Amino acid sequence: MKSIVEQELLFREKSVFEDQAIKQGYSRIAGVDEAGRGPLAGPVVAGACILPGGKLFLGIDDSKKLSPKQRRYLYELLLEDPEVTCGVGVVSVERIDEINILEATKEAMVQAIASLRSTPDFLLVDGLFLPHEIPCLKIIKGDSRSVSIAAASIIAKEYRDELMRKLHSEYPEYGFDKHKGYGTVAHLQALKQFGPCVYHRKSFSPVKESIREGICQ
């Protein structure tokens, strides 16, 4: 567990891109990230987040580096803070199969930005150049380098996990509540046994193979 001083230093380090944008005259800087590009099932979800300048949010980090308990706490903290603006975009399995996962991810990000109650004037995007009328900076591994993108990653991850738990209630045999659609050994075994359901991405290789083998719900 990091001390308060260490957490403050980490927050400052992760605010460099935001500080640079402020110096350039921007004031509403949104971090944008996705969750669910790699899974075999479920939608891809994007989060967008505008943090208020001058306010510390200790503990915010790449969602993958946080424990489920830490991530949930920060998710609720961000949503409940009236000074924080959060948005979410969701693109369905059908759309992923139609346009491919990269384009679907971009579409989810555009949706997330559009859903913000305050329109940003600058975007910090994790790993992708996003064609958008709002000025945009692509940051490789942005969820580890920008506090706004890290916040967006938490929003996207928690929101998607909730969706996958709902899908689990419809199709408990796949274990979506545990692996969230990723290609774990248990998921691949279930796919082999039961075939794909309506929430599987038919354009992804292991799902394609099960369809070719004639295994289906």
Swiss-Prot record:
Key words of the record: Cytoplasm, Endonuclease, Hydrolase, Manganese, Metal-binding, Nuclease
Comment on bound cofactor: Manganese or magnesium. Binds 1 divalent metal ion per monomer in the absence of substrate. May bind a second metal ion after substrate binding.
Give, as one word, the top-level EC class: hydrolase
Which GO annotations describe the biological process of this protein? Answer: DNA replication, removal of RNA primer; mismatch repair
Q: What reaction is this protein's catalytic activity?
A: Endonucleolytic cleavage to 5'-phosphomonoester
| EC numbers, comma separated | 3.1.26.4
**Mind telling me which InterPro entries this protein's record contains?**
RNase_HII (IPR022898), RNase_HII/HIII (IPR001352), RNase_HII/HIII_dom (IPR024567), RNaseH-like_sf (IPR012337), RNaseH_sf (IPR036397)
Question: Which co-factors does it depend on?
Answer: Mn(2+); Mg(2+)
Question: Which Gene3D superfamilies is this protein grouped with?
Answer: Ribonuclease H-like superfamily/Ribonuclease H
HAMAP family, per the entry: RNase_HII_B
Protein family: Belongs to the RNase HII family.
Q: What does this protein do?
A: Endonuclease that specifically degrades the RNA of RNA-DNA hybrids.
Please report the name of this protein according to its UniProt entry: Ribonuclease HII
Q: Which organism does this record belong to? A: Chlamydia muridarum (strain MoPn / Nigg)
